[in-house]
């Protein structure tokens, strides 16, 4: 959607078109290419696809698939255009693993003028009417909050840059800051669009688990269409792929059914227990390698062939993390996985327990190498509202009142749908982006360093920025030697005197973060 298309009046007519799946680009003869790659393993030269016979496709293809030699199917890549898919499906399934690439329409920058939302297969006219009423209320509240918050956004901008905002074009640009906060009330059913690229092997995997809870009905449609598009391009590509695991045989479904016979899940008690473990944090460091820095130093010495007498731990760590010594750190391109010395950052390891909004985790999960165990939401449904309130909402009394009243209202809609017999996986589509999620996330220091660098920038949305600051502070308290130079791009680049300090151009936040001694919540204006 262009900026011009996203700036008109809000339309309260609900549009719920079917998912649109288009295969945009793909390898020519992808299955033949996979077999040629397999043959190359046993050849002194590279085998061309033109040399592949029908017998080889059946014999080698079957042998590779049945024998678990699946990397040959990873060479073939498919790029899809996906439209009219729900954000719940994207979060729950499409982006729940690390092996993909997406460029997705952003609710932070694209105003949602039209009510475009997924409608699950809800039975009964009255139930469907109630569902659509809930969706409509989401958009009405979104529009209301956008208008209320715009004044705050403009005021803060004027204070930061010490000048009045009078230009309509600039006001329109600033309105995006208002909608990125207001989007917390939009439903999980809200449509999104994207370019989504994945390998043939990943498509095989998604096909296998297509019935996984909780968005299985939408998965069958979207993944089914993706598979049909590939089959049309190359009928051979799914020659040996087995049927998906039935819903009743999936481990999550079987576990839930067996648990019901013992003691039903109690989401309220679970949430209370989890939150008590967090204490004052929203992202709490719960586990780490005590000797992480020492392991990193050992790895540096092993890489460079040095003894401990030649290089102590502090100097070894500093050789990697000091931007004045490591030019790679001053670049926006992350090369830590291909730099021999920077691979030493892989050895320290950290685990966090986190409570965050669905909106925030949809950003958080895009850091695919910081892996997390995320909730199957249907097992954690609560009758009482359970949501995150953005900082910008809390400081505006009018917005806060509208926000809290809406949360009570939307949970009532969801509860009424459940009372009417609507399955929980369908009813939860009306829940807002603000719904609280609780998860366990872990990663090595290298991947966290990259994530923290991006999300500690003040251009990052406030919620994920605050979680990032909490994580960095806790690791700094335990291991100061690992955090001596950490921060957003501007903080890292100034330590090497690389200009410009800020890499965001005209998106600069307006605050000289590189001059701050530390990142503090109260220092951030927006």
Which functions belong to the PLM regions below?
Residues 1-526:
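A conserved ligand/cofactor-binding region detector
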């Amino acid at each position: 959607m262009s900026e011009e298309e996203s700036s008109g009046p809000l339309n309260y007519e609900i549009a719920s078109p079917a998912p649109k799946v288009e295969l945009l680009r793909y390898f020519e003869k992808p299955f033949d290419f996979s077999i040629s790659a397999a043959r190359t393993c046993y050849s002194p030269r590279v085998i061309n696809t033109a040399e592949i016979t029908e017998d080889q496709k059946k014999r080698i293809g079957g042998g590779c698939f049945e024998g678990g030699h699946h990397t040959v199917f990873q060479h073939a890549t498919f790029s899809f255009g996906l439209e009219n898919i729900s954000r719940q499906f994207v979060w729950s399934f499409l982006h729940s693993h690390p092996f993909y690439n997406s460029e997705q329409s952003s609710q932070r920058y694209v105003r949602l003028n039209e009510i475009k939302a997924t409608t699950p297969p809800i039975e009964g006219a009255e139930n469907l009417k109630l569902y659509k009423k809930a969706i409509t209320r989401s958009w009405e509240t979104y529009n209301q909050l956008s208008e209320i918050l715009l004044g705050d956004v403009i005021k803060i901008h004027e204070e930061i840059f010490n000048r009045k905002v009078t230009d309509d074009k600039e006001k329109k640009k600033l309105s995006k800051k208002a909608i990125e906060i207001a989007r917390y009330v939009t439903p999980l059913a809200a449509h999104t669009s994207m370019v989504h690229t994945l390998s043939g092997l990943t498509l095989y995997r998604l096909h296998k688990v297509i019935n996984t809870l909780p968005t299985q009905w939408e998965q069958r449609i979207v993944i089914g269409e993706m598979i049909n598009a590939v089959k049309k391009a190359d009928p051979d590509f799914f020659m040996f792929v087995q049927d998906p695991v039935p819903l009743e045989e999936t481990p999550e479904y079987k576990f839930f059914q067996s648990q019901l016979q013992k003691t039903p899940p109690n989401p309220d008690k679970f949430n209370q227990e989890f939150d008590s473990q967090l204490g004052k944090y929203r992202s709490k460091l719960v586990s780490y390698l005590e000797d992480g820095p020492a392991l990193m130093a050992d790895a540096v010495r092993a890489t460079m062939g040095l003894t401990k007498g030649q290089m102590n731990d502090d100097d070894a760590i500093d050789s990697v993390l000091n931007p004045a010594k490591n030019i790679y750190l001053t670049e926006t391109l992350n090369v830590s996985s291909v730099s021999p010395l920077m691979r030493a950052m892989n050895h320290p390891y950290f685990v966090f327990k986190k409570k965050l909004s669905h909106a925030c985790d949809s950003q958080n999960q895009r850091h695919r190498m910081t892996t997390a165990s995320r909730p199957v939401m249907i097992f954690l449904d609560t009758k009482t509202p359970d949501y995150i309130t953005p900082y910008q909402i809390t400081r505006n009394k009018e917005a806060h009142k509208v926000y809290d009243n809406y949360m009570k209202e939307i949970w009532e809609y969801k509860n009424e749908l459940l009372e009417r017999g609507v399955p929980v996986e369908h009813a939860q589509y009306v829940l807002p982006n603000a719904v609280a999620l609780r998860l366990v996330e872990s990663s090595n220091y290298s991947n966290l360093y990259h994530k923290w660098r991006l999300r500690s920038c003040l251009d990052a949305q406030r919620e994920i920025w605050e979680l990032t600051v909490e994580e960095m502070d806790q690791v700094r308290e335990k291991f100061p030697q690992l955090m001596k130079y950490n921060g957003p791009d501007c903080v890292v680049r100034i330590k090497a005197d690389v200009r410009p300090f800020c890499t965001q151009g005209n998106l600069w936040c307006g605050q000289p973060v590189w001059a701050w001694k530390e990142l503090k919540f109260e220092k951030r204006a927006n």
